[in-house]
Amino acid sequence: MKTGALTTFLALYLPVTVFATTLRLSNEVDLLVLDGKRVSGSLLRGADSIELENGPHQLVLRVEKNIRLSGNEERLYISPPLVISFDTQQTSQVNFHLPRLENEREASHFNAAPRLMLLDGDAMPIPVKLDILTTTSTAKVVDYEIETERYNKSAKRASLPQFATIMANDSTLLSDASELDAVPPQSQTLTEQRLKHWFRLADPQTRSHFLQWAEKQPSS
């Protein structure tokens, strides 16, 4: 796909007005999966927010925060993976609101009974369904996209079956510009679908940076 064609494609198919909800990111929340798709850490690095369309959404995340130990020591607390489902139909902004997590006792309570709220732009609670994602993988590195698919097929508290179908891995699709240009014809639709998806999630500044980068890439 030539750079000019890529830019035109994004401009035609991805108008800014399609977005209706801004998910404000938090440096104490590690976002793992969004709507059944693994989130690329490199894509979110430095971003303050993600743009979402109106409708149901599902996040898989971990809370990561430094907590106090005895004396003046600290350690990094990492929560179990959590699944949180919600609807943005009437919401223009979504913010994370975490309970107090300052010491080992509070961390243990959170592990046993996680409490995490989402607030709208007026600091009002958004109805959510929250659950712990129990992973079945014994691998050293857990594939949270696969675990989320399994969860969504199991009719659990925060399951959303519409997000159970996994698409292509975005890290392999977007890792190199030549990979975008050399995709076989039969995969072109999937490539465009994946590009559209991740471009939609990026905030306006990230989209602008991507378009500037695309313009500088040599045509094939």
UniProtKB/Swiss-Prot annotation:
It comes from the Bacteria. Keywords: Signal. Residues 1-20 form the signal peptide. Belongs to the UPF0319 family. This is UPF0319 protein YccT. It comes from Salmonella arizonae (strain ATCC BAA-731 / CDC346-86 / RSK2980). The lineage of its organism: Bacteria, Pseudomonadati, Pseudomonadota, Gammaproteobacteria, Enterobacterales.
